[in-house]
Amino acid sequence: MHVTLVEINVHEDKVDEFIEVFRQNHLGSVQEEGNLRFDVLQDPEVNSRFYIYEAYKDEDAVAFHKTTPHYKTCVAKLESLMTGPRKKRLFNGLMP
């Protein structure tokens, strides 16, 4: 299982817009055949910080995800909302 944890920091006045933009990516992602989990988490201490927990069955499923319209649209819209680049950490999922 291929797991990615993404940290996204957005401008404080863009939190609601971020949630709506990312909702579309979430709804599309959970429909993908290779997607096992796609959680959008908001930091309770920093309202403008989000974590995305993505689990896919393999790297091919991740590669497919990055070709989808919902992913491409989301990434394009995120640029103006973020305070800096996304931070990604990769993991091998052992026990889902």
UniProtKB/Swiss-Prot annotation:
Keywords: Cytoplasm, Isomerase. GO terms for cellular component: cytosol. Its EC number is 5.3.1.32. Induction: In the absence of AI-2, repressed by LsrR. Induced by AI-2, via release of the LsrR repressor. In the absence of glucose, induced by cAMP-CRP by direct binding to the upstream region of the lsr promoter. One of its GO terms (biological process) is quorum sensing. Homodimer. This is (4S)-4-hydroxy-5-phosphonooxypentane-2,3-dione isomerase. It comes from Escherichia coli (strain K12).
